[in-house]
Amino acid sequence: MNAFPPDPRKKSGFRTALEFTGIPPSWLDKRPRLPSRNWLIFLSVTQTFIGYYAYDRHQSRKIRQEYVDRVKHLAEDPLQSLDFPRTVTVYSAKWPGDDDWDRGSRYFRKYVKVCRSPLSQGGPFTHSFLAQPIFVAAAIDYTVIAGKRHGDLATRVANDIKTERRVALGLDPPPLSAPSLLAKGMTEAKRRRKHEGGTAVVGRAAFKEYMAGLRRGWTENLERLDEDEKLSRELEGDGHFDEPELSPGLSSDSLADAEPLPTPSRLPPSRPPGIYSPLSTPIRPPSPFPSPTAAPARDPGTDVPPPAYLPPQPALLLVPFVNLVGIKLVPLMIWEFFNERYKVRAGAEAAYKLVSCVARPFERTDLDFDASAEGYYKPSTASIPTDVQKARTEYYKALPEKLATARALSRGEREPTKLEIEAPPPTEVELRAERLKKEARWRADERGWESVCPDKPVEWDDRWEGVLEVFADPPTERWQ
């Protein structure tokens, strides 16, 4: 007798066929049921985040394509063989508190330009990029200039303006290897297209540095100065490398057989060795008759006054930029990750303003551009001047001991120790060069932070009234 009662349920032909395939009957008898509570929570949360992420990226692509369709007809205009495309100069500065100095440039490339293939051009400080939508749709080229440290961008802008002024006044030759009418015409056309292209400034820090460089470039004289040489002359009289005075209790008999110590008058000036350093050139006795050619030639740009008015300047595209740095801002970082469409729309609108070429006069209220971004600076940035002064104090506190060791070894007053043989201490010449490099770095950091700190207002000159322009929103019916 069969111990198992027959299954009263009637089997369908499909089920019978599946049983003959070798599938266990227990699998076929299993009925679907809801997952456990924990699995339901996990699946719900995961699918919610995935769905929101997919929706955000879909909207981002849709927004970008919308603005590309608005301007792509501009690329259909014919361009002559000797013409240049419209060129935009993009300025980006280091975000205070972030060691990554290129964040602003990457923000511009990702949201305003969407560039994917960088090409180096003009050294490590300047980069050109092959454009993708929206600018390539409008046949616009661009160049990014980024400052690696605070103040680099202001110095770059000021030096570029001074170079243009010197060339315009005939103090320097134009940057042409073989001047010709054709080359001159091409240069003028390129300069005109660059002026028409405009200038994009990314973020509050870059805006402050750009305006500071603009003021320095148009108000300072055109004298060419070697910054290292100027700083070396300033450091000559600080006394850190002066020879200590001879002790009055030391008799001359004790120095009869010893190597004479150099007096301060016999020492070379306190300056680092260089191409024209007195440490590398022989010292000549002074001539009893002054030579008329001994005095250095005066730079003709020293006496050039600043212009009474400014020439037309490229219109400014002010691009808001906030870089979230720090653990306290992690919630905002997460929110931005799932709401990237807002950045995409802001970048597309900024590019749309530039492409449309609709500008308005610069107003005083524009000086408050992106002022709210300064509230996201790390609190530690307020101690930058204190940190610089602390590093300077510690360095000069340890300098006398290093200098005494270098002089004692160079004069043979004592034998080097085992550690000094394995790792020779720096010589006096190396200490001078190191001090010059550190002082240049400290002073540049102090000036740079002073130009971008939240307490510092944006530079302004009354001569800029009516000269500077800002790209504005175009009329809505223009592109419809």
Can you describe what each PLM-predicted range is?
Residues 87-89, 141:
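Beta-sheet entry/capping signal
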Residues 90-95:
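Short loop/turn segments at strand-loop or loop-helix junctions that form parts
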Residues 17-73:
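Single-pass hydrophobic alpha-helical transmembrane segments typical
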Residues 97-115, 121-480:
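Non-transmembrane interaction and regulatory regions of membrane-associated proteins
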Residues 1-34, 161-165, 171-177:
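N-terminal organellar targeting/addr​essing segments, predominantly mitochondrial targeting sequences
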Residues 39, 77-80, 113-114:
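Beta-strand elements of modular eukaryotic interaction domains
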Residues 60-62, 74, 78-81, 142-145, ...:
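Short, flexible/disordered secondary-structure transition segments
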Residues 58, 67-86, 105-106, 125:
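Mature, function-bearing regions of proteins
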